[in-house]
Each structure stands twice: as C-alpha cells, then as structure tokens.
Amino acid sequence: MPKLLTDWSSQAAKRVTWLFTDVDDTLTWRGKLPAETLDAMQQLSLAGINVVPVTGACAGWCDQIARLWPVHGVIGENGAFWITKRQQQFHHHYCVPFSEMRKRQRYLLEQVKQVLASYPGLTLANDQSFRFCDVAVNIAQDRTPLSVELIEELLLQLRQLTVFGDPVQATESSIHINVWTGNHSKRSSSQSYLSQALNGEVNQGEVAYVGDSCNDEPMFSWINNSVGVNNITPYLPKLACPPQYMTRQNGGYGFAELAHFLLSAKE
C-alpha cells in the first residue's frame, strides 16, 4: 500500500524540479478543474518546478492545455505526441509520421466500431473527432460507469485487434478505454520528452509523477517519486506497481495538496 504523502522526506521532495501528471481525475475532479489546481500549477511554475500533463486526452484538449495553462508542455493521447511552447512558438512532436498515424487510426476506428456494435448503448468518447492517434471508448464520462466485468471483457476483445498486422494497445483510465497502435506509451514519451528537454541528462531524483488509475502504472514503475491522488484507492488491487505515496484528497484537490507539500519542502 502507498505511504502517506507526509512520509516522503522533505530532503528528497525538495529536489523535484519536474512534475509529470495525469489530467482526468488527477488535475480535475468530477469533470471540473478546481481553481485550487490551476493556482497550484502556477505556484509550482513560479517556484521552478516544471509541470507536464501526460494524458489520454485528445489532441484538441491538449492544444488548449499547452496554450493556456502554466505548464512546460503536454504529452497527449497516451504518448502519441507532445506539444511545447518556446519563445511564442508551438512545437509538435509525433511518435510516428502524422500521415501514418492518421491512416492507422482510421483503420483501427472501424474495427473498434465493429466491437461496440455488439454492445447497445456503448459509444466512442465524445471527443473522438478531435483525436490524432487513438480511439477512445466512453466507460464513465457523462454516463453511468460500466461494470468492472464489462470493462475487462471489452479490454480483452480490443487487445485482440490488429492494425496492418500489428497488435494494438488498450488501457483503462477513469473515464475511457483508450486503444491505439504503436509502441508509444505515457512512460516512453515522458522519457523522450525529458531527455530532449535536458539534453539526455536525466536525474530520477528530480522527477515526480502523480496519477489516479490503471493507465498510470507504467509511470509509477518508472518514477520512484510516484504519487496517487486519493481516488486511486479502488484501483490499487489491480496494480502490480502502485504509487509510493498517496494524498488524502481526491483529484485536483489532491494535486494541490501535493503541490503545497513540494513547495513547502523548498522553503
């Protein structure tokens, strides 16, 4: 089980200069971005802690995050791309050529639709048309959440799909099942993002991550300074590698709690 956030030594916490974070139900809570969360991101930025959202959210959502939020950049669609802003210029990096990414997505989309046809009432995510790479199935966003059994059944079927002979990945977040083709992941793209930003000189002790669900496990297994917001509790039995620490509060309020802890450690 994760330890309390207060068990993290202030000596170790004050070294953190990069905070990677999930978005839905980690920065947000019940579909809203709390004012406390936005203020926490701003305070972290002012203190020299670079915040990088790493999300399964669509490209359209990521564009406004990069433009409007006090963040260093954003990694979207579970690592398919990232966006940074430097000297008023936006830079996009894609894990595969953009045209190839869209071609594979179109092919995958038709296959996922065929799977969903056997489940009346199940739909794609409302933001599917704003996605570059993945296909998202709505399991809990603005609808009654699906049962654990049905989610597991869907994951099993979706993971059996192929795109031009290549297997697909499928992972569960708090609101969607995200399905994509390619070797990218939250972890691999976060590693590449950090290596690019630091010219390859990455110090694990300076990096932290916070998340809330199963699709954050690769990040928990990579980053030693890993934190779960309190609402990760129902997912803990599913995690072979849970976060090291956990906040007392849920979602964005838990993120603000983490931010205040990191800022206090630097005082």
Language-model features: locations:
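Active-site phosphate-binding/coordination module
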Residues: K32-D127
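Anion (oxyanion) recognition and catalysis
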Residues: S45-L46, R159, A240
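Short, well-ordered alpha-helix to beta-strand connector turns
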Residues: V16, G48, V71, N78, ...
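Conserved acidic, metal-coordinating active-site core of Asp-based
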Residues: V115-W222
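Active-site T/S-Asp motif of two-component receiver
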Residues: T21
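Mg2+-dependent phosphoryl-transfer enzymes with acidic/Ser/Thr/Gly-rich catalytic loops
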Residues: P2, S9, K14, P34, ...
